[in-house]
């Protein structure tokens, strides 16, 4: 990276503003469909390259500027000066920390932490969405709820697995029941109609039998 004077830096930004003004005034009516697509591709490449320039500025502010100079934290200063939200400002600071140039304690320049990603961004090959996905791959997993079990109170593996299974099956079961199981069709038992036995039923039966049924044949008639 070249060391430039303040006048040279101002000239570079002025020239960039002037070229953007010219580009804003041109008409694209003479272009064909493939040429329009190519123009959009070049514009996208330029848009992707611009954040790489801002990474160096943000890292320098983070390392050298005090809160008195900034009027608060770096996140608040960026949000106010650039007219963006604080979450967006925090994201830009995090991107600059991973993709921007760094310096060692001795002042020696260091490569970005995500060197390949930073190179691809400077070349306009990847954009903000790509950087977000790549940074998420290298970010350590966050602890859910920020809770850490104190020593001696860690749940046992069996209890923990049952707890996880219970939470996963919670929406699939009614309240107050165990784990959801496949529903079984109720067995249809065939029941005979039950009759109430009258106290005088045995006597009535003997009377009917003696009156309407013939007597059993005797041994002499066989």
UniProtKB/Swiss-Prot annotation:
Residues 160-169 have a biased composition (Low complexity). Residues 142-222 are annotated as: Disordered. InterPro entries: DUF222. One of its GO terms (cellular component) is plasma membrane. Residues 182-196 have a biased composition (Basic residues). It comes from the Bacteria. Disulfide bonds: none annotated. It holds the Pfam family DUF222. Belongs to the Rv1128c/1148c/1588c/1702c/1945/3466 family. This is Uncharacterized protein Rv1588c. It comes from Mycobacterium tuberculosis (strain ATCC 25618 / H37Rv).
